[in-house]
From Swiss-Prot:
One of its GO terms (cellular component) is cytoplasm. This is D-alanine--D-alanine ligase. Its EC number is 6.3.2.4. Belongs to the D-alanine--D-alanine ligase family. Mg(2+) 1 binds at residues 282, 294. Its main location: cytoplasm. Cell wall formation. It is found in: Cytoplasm. Keywords: ATP-binding, Cell shape, Cell wall biogenesis/degradation, Cytoplasm, Ligase, Magnesium, Manganese, Metal-binding, Nucleotide-binding, Peptidoglycan synthesis. Its cofactor is Mg(2+); Mn(2+).
Length: 342
């Protein structure tokens, strides 16, 4: 199976996508790498050039430029164009473009097989508000929340401390913990720099957090469950480093009841909305009760470090991707009308 990894994108998480791709360059054998820059141009990148300064310096523009057309990516020359020989595209664009449905729409429009969230899954998981509404529809608890828009009065419904998050961003960008009213205005200003909507939740000290990745191919694949041990809040720089992980992690020490509860919740969220994607879901546990925190439709480094045999998972998903219905356009209705007029 020949994979083409698409990364970059016009996103606040552009650099994280680069780090994420560098981390997995040796994990997907023989992969082709396609960079989507801030102008939304595609470039074919040699594996040897997958270094952060290759992109920050602008040297990537010396790489061959690609065009996205029906069936795949193409490299043009003076006399001809050559199709890039990829069987399946892997969406590794974090944030906007990759997780909001733009790339999924393009790939589906041009009938290209890809591993990544489909349009509906992208739209729901890209919005923290829609994620919570979807989780509740699936019967999974979420923490209390309040949505605040720029034009709204800056009044919050919770006692302090609270956590403030841009509604459409990940990687801790624009996120603040607010301990009293004197800190509120500044935290909101920071969040509104990145988004027109923010989500406010109670900030609960000592809450347990667990991450589980998974995917569905011929069968369901669950990763190890990671117990997240971190500071009060991972800032962007720490998340930046976190996305570059590639070594395996230890499976969390959980009782079997909680382990099954987390897996069952994951499966309810995943199937069928995220078919064809490898996703990670972050859960909270408080007083023995499970809550969904966030859905990561394009997790850092595809969460490869959570799986015992990531390549086998990738191959199984690639072989069982969702297929669009073949709609036959035969103009039968128009032709029947024309025949009736004669």
């Amino acid at each position: 199976m020949q994979y083409a990894v698409v990364f970059g994108g016009k996103s606040y998480e552009h650099e994280i996508s680069i780090v994420s791709t560098i981390a997995i360059k040796d994990i997907i054998p023989g992969a082709i790498f396609i960079f989507l820059d801030g102008n939304r141009d595609f470039y074919l990148i040699e594996k040897a050039d997958l270094k952060s300064n290759y992109f920050s310096s602008g040297n990537y523009k010396k790489s061959p430029k690609l065009e996205l057309k029906k069936g795949g990516f193409y490299q043009k020359s003076l006399l001809k164009e050559k199709k890039i020989p990829a069987d399946v595209v892997i969406n590794l664009v974090h944030g906007a473009d990759g997780e909001d449905g733009k790339l999924a729409s393009l790939l589906e429009f041009f009938e290209i097989d890809y591993i990544g969230p489909r349009i509906e899954g992208s739209v729901i998981s890209y919005s923290k508000l829609l994620t919570k509404l979807y989780a509740k529809e699936c019967g999974i608890e979420v923490l209390p929340y309040q949505l605040l828009r720029k034009q709204d009065k800056k009044i919050i419904d919770f006692e302090y401390p609270v956590i403030i998050k841009p509604n459409h961003l990940g990687s801790s960008i624009g996120v603040s913990v607010v301990y009293d009213s004197s800190e509120l205005e500044y935290a909101l200003d920071v969040a509104f720099e990145f988004d027109d909507e923010v989500l406010i939740e109670p900030f609960i000290e000592g809450i347990e957090e667990y991450n589980l990745a998974g995917a569905k191919g011929q069968t369901f694949h669950f990763s190890k469950i990671e117990a997240v041990k971190k500071e009060k809040l991972l800032d962007f720089e720490k998340k930046y480093l976190d996305f570059g992980r590639s070594g395996e992690v230890k499976d969390a020490s959980l009782n079997e009841t909680l382990r099954l509860h987390i897996r069952n919740a994951f499966e309810k969220i995943y199937d069928p909305l995220f078919s064809g994607a490898i996703i990670r879901i972050d859960f909270f546990v408080r007083d023995g009760k499970l809550y969904l925190n966030e859905i990561n439709p394009v997790p850092g480094s595809l969460a490869n470090y959570l799986f015992g045999d990531f390549r086998a998972v990738l191959e199984d998903v690639a072989k069982h991707l969702p297929k669009s219905k073949n709609i036959v356009i035969d103009y039968r209705y128009i032709n029947s009308i024309q025949s009736a007029k004669k």
